[in-house]
Regions:
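Non-catalytic accessory segments of hydrolases
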Residues: 2, 21-200, 479-497, 508-514, ...
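Sec-dependent signal peptide recognition
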Residues: 5-12
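Hydrophobic h-region of N-terminal signal peptides that target proteins for export
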Residues: 14-22
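Short, solvent-exposed loop/turn elements at domain surfaces
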Residues: 53, 61-68, 327-328, 378-381, ...
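Serine-hydrolase-like catalytic core of hydrolytic proteins
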Residues: 56, 98-308, 348-351, 356-384, ...
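Substrate-gating cap/lid region and adjacent catalytic-acid/histidine neighborhood
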Residues: 259-269, 302-489, 500, 507, ...
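Mobile gating loops/cap/lid regions near enzyme active sites that modulate substrate access
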Residues: 383, 425, 429-620
Length: 620
């Protein structure tokens, strides 16, 4: 997402768009039709008018700090009937729109470490014939692994229209979800606790709960699809290469995610200066705690002290610190406090081969994969760049339309290549025949308040989610993002996407959708000139169609070098450098050789990287 210092009008627009598919805060009443018994006891849910739902079911517990940076404790059995009528605790994070915190608390530390809850939605005919169990789709939310929660999106329309069961899960975030310090992991009693990828371990624990219990809700435990967007997509990819997750799911959907793991060496090292394209360091977090506790006067003395403290002293410091102290230390050690935390190859949960290496080596070979990105992913993240946008009467304006679209195109193409095209091509060449790829191109936003939303946002990051969930709040959307003119086509496109997603969940192949009447979505074919992926767009922009186009590293660099929409060659150098530094597209020497050595005499640190270090305000 992007910063709260973004213009008020854009906040309203985006909040309305994203919140259109969120779950209204309503007091739900018990429905006796939802009374059932699961492994820990009896439970009752509610009827939201469209589906049955059971909210706030605890699948694991973090009862105190002794369980911090460990697998969650098993939940206890209960007496009586558990009322699953409201969502469970939010995991610790900064208050924001995407964790449904009240606006006055945006930027505050909110939530609880004891947050391992999930929610279940089922069609209202689910108990009519329990011999006909339904496919299960487990949603892993996004938010850079530092924010978000399971109650932000409402899957009721997907559930009711496509006859599937959806489970959404919370998982630990930020320094509680991804943290690897030698003095914590060295005394761990099992491989999971040694991992450091605790947010991914939470997902595995939730999937184990699904295997034990989903049949009580009418679901098929032998037909589970995991799907997630952004960081949730990264976490889906990590689960594909985690041996502990083997057999817990049978299909996987990665929406605007990626496969590049985090840097385990960086996470455990001392860093005199954090880099904006890296995640935080556990060593530096401890340094900050030592300063906060007045055990050291500054960072350098803290590093010296840390080296001389025993393992037990370091662990005691970390476990005795309050939730707020841990999080404040974490925020203080990051250049960009909303930079995404990626699962790292710890050798316990995630193989040292990484995600792609694990898949290419044959692990989880039989799991069909759907993977895709949005055409204009990066527009959402570029909005806060004052060199590309300006503010006029509190309304964002594009400074140079050609440059804006060009920068977004090349940065978004880099994402697509690394997250979709490269892994799909490599996996299918290695023998996989069940990789299905897409690109979401819908960009029919109207012009509102003088803002050209079609160009400003287009098919931006996360904008496909309401189409997949199918829940559009017409009052909010027609006022800000959608219009009465395009609403009918939006709903038609959404219905098609839900149908493809559901058919994939049923049979592992999106095919022609549930009704068999849509464009045939074929698997990625690595052959030259063969169809590769499907495009989702409005009818007047080409509609739903297959294409044989795909990206390579060489093509990306050539497209950038020959783009006449970018007049200043320094922008081309910066775009390539960003792809190298942030995305690991290629090696640094490629920048020096780029476009007849145009960039070789430039110093990235003074020409453009200085802008990357600017302190970011809280993203909402």
């Amino acid at each position: 997402m992007f910063s709260v210092n973004i213009k008020k009008i854009l906040l309203v627009i985006l909040a309305s768009y994203l919140a259109s598919c969120s779950i209204p805060k309503t007091d739900f009443e018990q429905d006796q039709n939802t009374l059932l018994t699961i492994d820990k006891g009896s439970i009752i849910g509610s009827n939201n008018g469209n589906t049955y739902q059971w909210l706030g079911i605890q699948y694991g517990s973090i009862p105190d700090s002794s369980y911090r940076w460990k697998r969650g404790a098993e939940t206890e059995k209960w007496d009586g009937v558990y009322e699953a009528l409201e969502f469970g605790n939010t995991c610790v994070q900064k208050g924001s729109l995407i964790n449904t915190t009240k606006r006055r608390n945006w930027g505050d530390i909110v939530g609880s470490e004891d947050c391992l809850y999930l929610n279940v939605w089922a069609p209202k005919d689910v108990f009519d014939d329990l011999s006909q169990s339904k496919p299960v789709m487990v949603w892993i939310h996004g938010g850079s692994n530092v924010s978000g929660n399971a109650d932000f999106y409402d899957p009721s329309e997907l559930v009711s229209s496509q006859d599937v069961i959806v489970v959404s899960i919370n998982y630990r975030l930020g320094p509680f979800g991804w943290f690897r310090h030698p003095d914590i992991t060295s005394t761990a009693q099992n491989p999971e606790d040694q991992s450091g990828n605790y947010g991914n371990i939470d997902s595995i624990q939730a999937l184990e709960w699904v295997q034990r219990n989903i049949e009580f809700f009418g679901g098929d435990s032998s037909n589970v699809t995991i799907f997630g967007e952004s960081a949730g997509g990264y976490n889906v990819a990590a689960l594909l290469s985690a041996k502990q997750a083997n057999g817990l799911f049978h299909k996987a959907i990665i929406q605007s995610g990626g496969i590049r793991p985090g840097d385990i060496e960086h996470s455990e090292s001392y860093l005199e200066k954090n880099l904006p394209w890296k995640s935080y360091s556990s060593r530096e977090l401890v340094n900050e705690l030592l300063v906060m506790n007045e055990m050291a006067s500054d960072r350098n003395s803290a590093a010296t002290l840390q080296e001389n403290l025993s393992q037990k002293e370091i662990e005691a410091l970390m476990r005795n610190a309050s939730t707020a102290e841990i999080y404040e230390a974490y925020l203080a050690t990051k250049t960009n406090t909303d930079d995404m935390l990626r699962p790292f190859p710890d050798g316990n949960l995630l193989s040292e081969l990484g995600i792609l290496g694990s898949l290419e080596s044959g692990f989880n070979m039989d799991v069909p994969i759907m993977i895709g990105t949005n055409r204009d992913e990066m527009k959402l993240f570029l909005l806060n760049n004052p060199r590309l946008t300006r503010e006029f009467l509190r309304i964002p304006r594009i400074r140079d339309l050609d440059l804006w679209n060009a920068v977004s195109k090349h940065r978004s193409n880099s994402w697509k290549y690394l997250a979709v095209d490269e892994p799909a091509q490599n996996l299918t060449r290695s023998g996989r025949s069940n990789i299905y790829a897409y690109r979401f191109d819908w960009d029919d936003e109207p012009r509102k308040y003088g803002v050209d939303l079609k160009n400003l946002l287009g098919a931006a990051h996360a904008f496909e989610i309401p189409f997949v969930m199918g829940n559009f709040d017409e009052d909010a959307l027609t006022k800000y993002i959608l219009s009465r003119k395009n609403m009918e086509e939006v709903k038609t496109l959404s219905q098609s996407m839900m149908s493809y997603w559901a058919e994939f969940a049923y049979n592992g192949d999106p095919d022609k959708g549930r009704e068999g009447n849509l464009t045939d979505w074929k698997a990625w074919d690595p052959g030259k000139g063969r169809e590769k992926y499907i495009i989702f767009d409005s009818t007047h922009d080409g509609g739903i169609r297959m294409t044989n186009d795909y990206l390579t590293e060489e093509k990306l660099i050539e497209m950038l070098a020959t783009d006449n929409k970018i007049q200043d060659y320094k922008w081309k150098c910066e775009i390539l450098d960003a792809a190298i530094m942030f995305d690991h597209l290629t090696t640094q020497n490629v920048l020096n050789d780029f476009n007849n050595n145009q960039c070789s005499d430039l110093d990235p640190s003074t020409e453009w990287r200085k802008y990357w270090y600017d302190e970011k305000e809280q993203r909402y």
